[in-house]
Amino acid sequence: YTLFESRLSGSLDFFIRDGKDVIGDYKVPLPPYLHESIVANVGTTTSKGFEFQANWDAVRTEDFSYSTNVMLSYTTSKLKSFSNEKYQLGFIEGEGFPSPGNPGSAQRLQDDTPIGSFYGFRYAGVDDAGNILIWKGGEIGGDTKLGSDGDEKDKVYLDGTGVPKWELSWGNTFTYKNFDLSLFFRGRFGYKVMNQYEMYYGLQVVAGDNKLSSAYEENAHIKGPKVICDYFLQNGNYLRLDNITVGWTPKLNTKWIS
């Protein structure tokens, strides 16, 4: 679209994208196969959303001008299937967290679930000794148990994913006589992060570690070991100034150049 004598322009696009041939590692029988697993292109995905772009020459005077441009996108993606008639795969665990403690993985990719889904225990507080409690079977308001005793039956898909739904880029350009200033902002919204720093350095349990102040402040009630649960799942939203450019264009005597 173009409006106001081309001072405002942009576009709005909607999309649905289907992907196929996603690579997976599948178990196969011995024989006839030579190895117990095989890599195959089987998985399918789907994404949908929109992209909005706008450019606006907001101010035009003899000495001063201001223009801005913005791009905003919204996307949701999910894995449709990891299997077909020949190869079957229920899910794939994400990369596990490292030592010390080796608490396991915080993400799982499974049929008909959003890409980037978090999978783990639901936090239910702490016991008298400060050990993390979880909801048994992931049912909030039900029975609780020690997080260290949790098993696969207690894990559920947690709220939010690690993939941003919204992405924003916003550029601004100011000019005054021979000077110009450009500011570029970038942001991502609608996603979660598993705060690994809080899990490893924000708890008091390991003596001698260089800890965050949060170990003795907001996390002071936790005295036991770390457990992958939604207590450490936090909003990842951010908007930051990504780049600043300042320029000066001197007036040159063209006679000198010639």
Regions found by a protein language model. Give the residues of each.
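Flexible, solvent-exposed coil segments and beta strand-coil junctions
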Residues: 26-37, 143-153, 219-230
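Extracytoplasmic gating/loop element in the C-terminal half of outer-membrane beta-barrel translocons
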Residues: 117, 130, 186-258
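Residues that define the transmembrane beta-barrel architecture of outer-membrane proteins
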Residues: 46-50, 64, 164-168, 233, ...
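Outer-membrane beta-barrel and related beta-rich outer-membrane complex signature
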Residues: 22-26, 74-92, 191-215
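Outer membrane beta-barrel strand-and-loop segments of large Gram-negative receptors
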Residues: 11-58, 155-158
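Conserved small-residue
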Residues: 40-46, 50, 57-160
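Membrane-embedded beta-strands that build the outer-membrane beta-barrel scaffold
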Residues: 1-3, 8-16, 50-58, 66-74, ...
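Gram-negative outer-membrane beta-barrel proteins
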Residues: 5, 18-22, 34-36, 60, ...
